[in-house]
Amino acid sequence: MARNEIRPLVKLRSTAGTGYTYITRKNRRNDPDRITLRKYDPVVRRHVDFREER
């Protein structure tokens, strides 16, 4: 029960507009705001920013 409250699953959607997503867990205590990670988007074949989607 406590596991889902502290570290929920979040979707990271590509800012390149391809619709590609990653799914990861996030620690709400360390990152209360929306997270942005730079990851690989295979559709455009380059690294782009992925933002948390709610």
From Swiss-Prot:
PROSITE patterns: RIBOSOMAL_L33. It comes from the Bacteria. Pfam families: Ribosomal_L33. Gene3D superfamilies: Ribosomal protein L33 (2.20.28.120). One of its GO terms (biological process) is translation. Signal peptide: none annotated. HAMAP family: Ribosomal_bL33. The gene is rpmG2. It comes from Mycolicibacterium vanbaalenii (strain DSM 7251 / JCM 13017 / BCRC 16820 / KCTC 9966 / NRRL B-24157 / PYR-1). This is Large ribosomal subunit protein bL33B.
